[in-house]
Amino acid sequence: MESKLKINGIEYGSRFRGEDPRVPGFTESHFKPPLRVMFVGAHPDDPDVRCSGFARTLVEAGHRVRFVALCNGDKGHQFMPSEEVGRRRYGESRKVIATLGIEDYIVADNPDCEVEPTLENRRWLTRVIREFGPHIIVTHRPNDYHCDHRATATLVQDATYLVGVPLWCPDAPVPEVIPTVLFMGDRFTQPAPFRPDFVIDVSRHEDVIVDTFACHESQMFEWLVPEHGYSLADVPPADDVEGRRRFIRKSALHLVADYARAFDEAVAKAYPGRNPRLVEVYEKSEYGRTPVPAERSLLASLGGVWLDSVQSKWTQVK
């Protein structure tokens, strides 16, 4: 007969097998590589545009990476019907798996422009997180420009705590680690400007970043072209692969390169005398777990630099 969890003489059922399923505190002794990192964006191109360099760095070093999109992106086009856009963008996410070498790209079936922090979405994301058990989740800041981005940020922060609550979604086992949450870089200043706590030089991955962008044909060569300052007549034909790579470099690669300019002081502090051309920047959320020294050291060994600006006096309060 299975033992039951007893607290103050009350039995709480056999599913716990006599043990509290939660880890009391994630320490050095709990951390065992490879690192598991989950990039959670609103649309099936958000993690790619902002984080593909970091993702590729992790994959090359043998760590586990998954991408997640909270909606199917079916409104991201000026001509095609939504149903066709959604199918097409799902296919583009499959190309990203092969290009970046990530494990999976999970795309939720929420319509574009309709992501909300509902109970249904919170449960769905909790199960996705628990199944993978990431050490780190990367997502949008709650004050990003798109309503879907803001809702995704809220969902991640809500789910991050609930991941460790056994009676929430009890069908999905609680993982041994509550994730650290990092925010992708952005340019917004209200209610607070982005704070670059972790900086990583991704210049050596420029070709892979360009090819990852190019996987999203419906976006980079159609929908976003006017937003990037070009017309559809400027886009090379689909069979001109090198021409399209050159077009990405002049029309869209600034989405990565601009971070080096916007956060030049942080980049100079992280890489004195180096002046890297392509960097990605991340802010540590106050939600989630603080990385243990072994995780910080591992990321540093990959070329990342922690600037520690997130530390506050609360870390000294016992």
Model-inferred region functions:
Residues 72-74, 112-114, 188, 206, ...:
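Residue-level detector of flexible, active-site-proximal loop/helix-junction positions
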Residues 2-132, 162, 303, 311-316:
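Active-site rim/loop-helix segments in enzyme catalytic domains that contact anionic ligands
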Residues 2-33, 169-170, 177, 192, ...:
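C-terminal accessory domains and tails appended to enzymatic cores
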Residues 77-80, 192-196:
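Short acidic, glycine/proline-rich loop/turn micro-motifs
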Residues 83, 87, 150, 154, ...:
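Short, conserved loop/turn and helix-capping segments at secondary-structure boundaries
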Residues 66, 94, 99, 103-186, ...:
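Internal alpha/beta domain cores that form substrate/cofactor-binding pockets in large enzymes
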Residues 142, 186-187, 205, 216:
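Histidine- and/or cysteine-centered catalytic micro-motif in compact active-site loops
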Residues 92, 155, 159, 208-215:
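Amphipathic alpha-helical segments that form well-ordered structural scaffolds
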